[in-house]
């Protein structure tokens, strides 16, 4: 298709714009079209989604269509939406079409890549399994992250998904010197601004790219922004051979944006009003996130669970792609235990003695066993009280409460809110700490000493102070 062919707008339905072209000059699907908004003088990018006959193409706008009118001239760029790639984008904030939104000047990238790209061939993909250490005890012990894997953070509103994501970005940048790409998909602009300021303060911004398509933006931008971020991450993996962390906050908003445009594009809705192409849309994004022989992209995806219903089609479709799941629980958050990760619902496919080692596996299973038994005893405790339990069960409760508290941890990114300095705990320290609790070596240490501690030595220090 020749670049520069011209058409004109024939219909505008919110974010969906129909454009008529000469029959012999129709743009391809996914081509980016440009139209100048007469009210603002700014160009609006339209992405071709359907060819509907008689020279008319149906497009989705990447910016507000306020001010556009029928009859306006539209130009075909002859190519899909592209994103700037390379080290020039580090430390910058971009929008869905790769424009800077941080008022820090133009991005002088040497290359731009199209955001629609095929997933790596099977022969290019890596088959080795490695653990990515996060420094967060509950994750490293019970739901270890595979390098190049996909990890889901499930939770309702306000249980701490975004804070956990911010801590991971900080740990990867400072402890691992890795690059991170953050895709803000349909989340609050305030949170994006806070994240940017937080990263400037902690000095990790130089290793990070932020790509935002926030709540106030049209569904087209929210639907495509994850692909823009992924394209930038793919460059670091494929050309520079880096291990990259891709954060998507929130993958549910990606699905939600897709369902918003789907009905306007004239597609019949499927279950719960979602788009009929839900599984395909999700697959096209997720299959590009993988390890190759050159480098890896490990993806952490915050997943909002509508009305805390995990069977909703959006979270349920995401589940199929994940290697590890971190479930955040309102019940644990209400106890004041942060991160509010549910140790029984969270899991990882690599928690296997052949991968993590026998000791790690046995300590993790031992911790879950004690916590599960404690959960089973809750009804008896509520009715009869702890005193009516057998000595063995009393010991289970005693240790479970210490484990529960030791799973909490102060975060670096929350320091200015909590006043507690953050802690990064290596995996070996985490395993050693929980092993000592399971072996009964700390049965005489007060519960309170375990709360919001780093490693087990810090707990012992606190216990000494409490006794003195």
From Swiss-Prot:
Residue sites binding ATP per the record: 155-162
Topology of the protein relative to the lipid bilayer: Peripheral membrane protein
MF term (GO), any: ATP binding
Protein location: Cell inner membrane
UniProt xrefs under InterPro entries: AAA+_ATPase, ATP-synt_VA_C, ATP_synth_F1_bsu, ATPase_a/bsu_AS, ATPase_alpha/beta_chains, ATPase_F1/V1/A1_a/bsu_N, ATPase_F1/V1/A1_a/bsu_N_sf, ATPase_F1/V1/A1_a/bsu_nucl-bd
Keyword vocabulary terms for this entry: ATP synthesis, ATP-binding, Cell inner membrane, Cell membrane, CF(1), Hydrogen ion transport, Ion transport, Membrane, Nucleotide-binding, Translocase, Transport
Chemical reaction(s) catalysed: ATP + H2O + 4 H(+)(in) = ADP + phosphate + 5 H(+)(out)
Coiled-coil positions: none
Principal subcellular localization: membrane
E.C. code: 7.1.2.2
GO cellular component, one term: proton-transporting ATP synthase complex
Family named by the database record: Belongs to the ATPase alpha/beta chains family.
Quaternary state and interactors: F-type ATPases have 2 components, CF(1) - the catalytic core - and CF(0) - the membrane proton channel. CF(1) has five subunits: alpha(3), beta(3), gamma(1), delta(1), epsilon(1). CF(0) has three main subunits: a(1), b(2) and c(9-12). The alpha and beta chains form an alternating ring which encloses part of the gamma chain. CF(1) is attached to CF(0) by a central stalk formed by the gamma and epsilon chains, while a peripheral stalk is formed by the delta and b chains.
Function as written in the Swiss-Prot or TrEMBL entry: Produces ATP from ADP in the presence of a proton gradient across the membrane. The catalytic sites are hosted primarily by the beta subunits.
Name the record gives this protein: ATP synthase subunit beta
Organism per entry: Thermotoga maritima (strain ATCC 43589 / DSM 3109 / JCM 10099 / NBRC 100826 / MSB8)
Gene: atpD
